[in-house]
Regions:
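Intrinsically disordered, low-complexity N-proximal targeting/linker segments that flank membranes
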Residues: 1-47, 61-64, 150-155
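Membrane-helix exit/interface motif
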Residues: 50-59, 85-95
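Membrane-interacting alpha-helical segments
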Residues: 90-155
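Hydrophobic alpha-helical membrane-embedded segments
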Residues: 71-92
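Periodic glycine anchor positions in long extracellular repeat architectures
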Residues: 41, 76, 80, 122-123
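Perimembrane loop-to-helix junctions flanking transmembrane segments
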Residues: 57-65, 104-105
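Juxtamembrane "helix exit" motif at the C-terminal ends of alpha-helical transmembrane segments
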Residues: 44-61, 129-130, 145
């Protein structure tokens, strides 16, 4: 990761020369994949948590559903954080240096991907700081749904 990558990620447009410099393409690609896998894991966990409570026939009250939503989302986000580097490794080992550089270079200019990654980091941070783990899960879930809607519902 470099200062140029962070500047682009934060929304400050670097020069063309700075955009050409990709000193750590594996790390840049890994961050992108890990953010996406955490978002996906949190959303799937948030859906499966209440469903598992419903299937288990335990005492079904509102607080139990909220707790299962949060714990499912947290577990999904943790699994996504673990799977992100694994998925990155599996993808990168099949790429040569030029194709990896090309992928990172394209990600730097892909406004939809940048918007989705920025939204995930920002909403997860705001959610965590405002409401703890519940806010983190809701932030990750909403960031995925909103960014998909903003990019034209291309699932």
């Amino acid at each position: 990761m470099s200062a140029n990558w962070f500047k682009n990620f934060a929304g400050f447009r670097p020069s063309e020369f700075e955009m050409l410099q990709v000193p750590n393409p594996k790390l840049e690609f890994g961050i992108h994949v890990t953010i996406r896998s955490m978002q996906t894991g949190a959303l799937i966990g948030s859906i499966l948590g209440p469903i598992s409570l419903l299937v288990s026939q335990k005492a079904n009250n509102k607080q139990n559903y909220i707790d299962s939503f949060v714990s499912g989302g947290q577990n999904g986000a943790v699994i996504g954080a673990i799977m992100g580097p694994v998925l990155t490794y599996l993808s990168v080992r099949e790429m040569n240096t030029i194709s990896l550089y090309d992928k990172c270079y394209r990600l730097r200019f892909n406004q939809d991907a940048l918007r989705q990654d920025r939204t995930a980091v920002f909403s997860a941070a705001v959610g965590l700081l405002s409401s703890g783990s519940t806010g983190l899960v809701v932030g990750l879930d909403l960031s995925l749904l909103i960014s998909k809607l903003m990019s034209g519902c291309r699932w």
